[in-house]
């Protein structure tokens, strides 16, 4: 080993010893402020705890959810007969800008959700008069019978389905204008992508018979529309729709899930 290498080795050894000494010193200093509990402290704490008094309360026994089951409100499906086809008559008219209903029926059916996103506006609405009846016309005792003023607003519903030629509709009954089967929001789905047009309702009907499964009320609807925004004075046949109960606070309440 050369003189130069011996000198470097000696310097490195000294540096390592200095680092070790500095580390030990820092360790001692870091613990200098550590507090230790004395027997007197423990005695004072125990004395303080023993001097406290408590007010007695009665607690209910803990209830286990192991035996609880999710159950739908079965009686809800027995109130109305949903095995047939309900007939609805919808008269649409132009409203006003303050309610966002100052649009034509053609505009409602023209745009998809992508169009609204590109325009940066909410979905257009029109005024609507919804009446329920049979193939002969609105029936007394049913929603909208004998009325001429709008009782609802109408807009398209759905996402990708809004691009279809035949639209799905959301009919929102106005406050104080009544309800249809306890519902103010009536969703009508066309199911253009489903050739049979009945599988959605069939699925909900099957769910009703399965324990611990939650369903929604459904109904086939034959829809007629009179477009007063274009000057029409007669109802056009829009064909078969599936009405599906809107999953909102009202639905959660009647199904016992609120």
Where would I find each of the regions flagged by the language model?
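Phosphate/dinucleotide-binding and metal-coordinating scaffold of catalytic cores
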Residues: 34-258
């Amino acid at each position: 080993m050369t003189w130069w290498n011996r000198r470097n080795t000696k310097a490195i050894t000294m540096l390592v010893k200095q680092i070790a000494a500095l580390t030990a010193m820092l360790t001692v200093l870091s613990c200098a402020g550590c507090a230790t509990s004395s027997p007197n402290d423990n005695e004072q704490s125990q004395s303080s705890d023993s001097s406290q008094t408590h007010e007695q309360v009665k607690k209910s026994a803990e209830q286990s959810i192991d035996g609880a089951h999710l159950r739908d409100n079965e009686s809800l499906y027995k109130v109305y007969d949903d095995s047939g086809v309900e007939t609805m008559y919808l008269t649409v008219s132009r409203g006003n800008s303050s309610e966002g209903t100052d649009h034509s029926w053609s505009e409602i059916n023209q745009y998809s959700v992508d169009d609204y996103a590109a325009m940066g506006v909410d979905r257009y609405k029109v005024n609507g008069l919804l009446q329920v009846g049979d193939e002969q016309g609105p029936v007394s005792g049913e929603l909208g019978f004998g009325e001429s003023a709008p009782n609802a607003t109408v807009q398209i519903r759905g996402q990708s389905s809004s691009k279809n030629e035949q639209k799905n509709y959301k009919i929102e009954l106005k406050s104080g204008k009544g309800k249809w089967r306890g519902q103010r929001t009536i969703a009508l789905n066309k199911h253009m992508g489903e050739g049979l047009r009945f599988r959605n309702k069939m699925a909900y009907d099957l769910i009703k018979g399965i324990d611990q499964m939650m369903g929604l009320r459904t109904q086939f609807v034959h829809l007629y529309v009179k477009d007063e925004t274009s000057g029409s004075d007669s109802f056009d046949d829009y064909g078969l729709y599936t009405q599906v109960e809107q999953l909102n606070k009202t639905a959660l309440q009647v199904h016992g899930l609120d």
